[in-house]
Amino acid sequence: MGFFSSLSSLFGLGKKDVNIVVVGLDNSGKTTILNQLKTPETRSQQIVPTVGHVVTNFSTQNLSFHAFDMAGQMKYRSTWESYFHSSQGVIFVLDSSDRLRMELLKDELMMVMEHKDVVSRGIPIVILANKMDIPGAMTASDITVALGLNLYRSGTWSIHSTCALTGDGLDKAMQQLSAEITKYMESRRT
């Protein structure tokens, strides 16, 4: 098996390693989402708030992800940008039931979407409108309008409704992110 894995890697047929940054305000569900993306036997039983950052590894069909789960508390948000230069993708997680912090959320999301490393390198961004299971949560369409994303034409981004606790919506979002990262990596080779 090791021989075939080595041979696959040599010819570019194996899974590609990619770095992604996972950001969003505190208590949006970033760590819970990453926990859902791991294999069942490697999932944590207890989720605690992230301090600084934690690296989580998981795979999709064609990519091996090294996800930098960044703390969302205000004192840590300034550290997010130092990870963009070495990333091939960004996941921005938001709590779709947190209507009180929509303006703050918009500011932080725009900081990410307009960051020089994200823009100049064309890094794809997947926005996860999490906690859709909570009564009164905003829909992805409502969030798109509330954050002004319907007017945002530059960059590669998409928004997906998710529920971190059940995993609903995560497969589709990760398929989208994987496809966008694959396109991004291919465009960087030419």
UniProtKB/Swiss-Prot annotation:
InterPro entries: Arl6 (IPR041839), P-loop_NTPase (IPR027417), Small_GTP-bd (IPR005225), Small_GTPase_ARF (IPR024156), Small_GTPase_ARF/SAR (IPR006689). The keyword Nucleotide-binding applies. Specifically expressed in ciliated cells. GO terms for cellular component: axoneme; cytoplasm; cytosol; dendrite. One of its GO terms (molecular function) is GTPase activity. Keywords: Cytoplasm, GTP-binding, Lipoprotein, Myristate, Nucleotide-binding. GO terms for biological process: cilium assembly; intracellular protein transport; intracellular transport; PERK-mediated unfolded protein response; protein localization to cilium; vesicle-mediated transport. A lipid is attached at G2 (N-myristoyl glycine). It comes from the Eukaryota. Its main location: cytoplasm. It is found in: Cytoplasm. PANTHER family: ADP RIBOSYLATION FACTOR-RELATED. This is ADP-ribosylation factor-like protein 6. The lineage of its organism: Eukaryota, Metazoa, Ecdysozoa, Nematoda, Chromadorea.
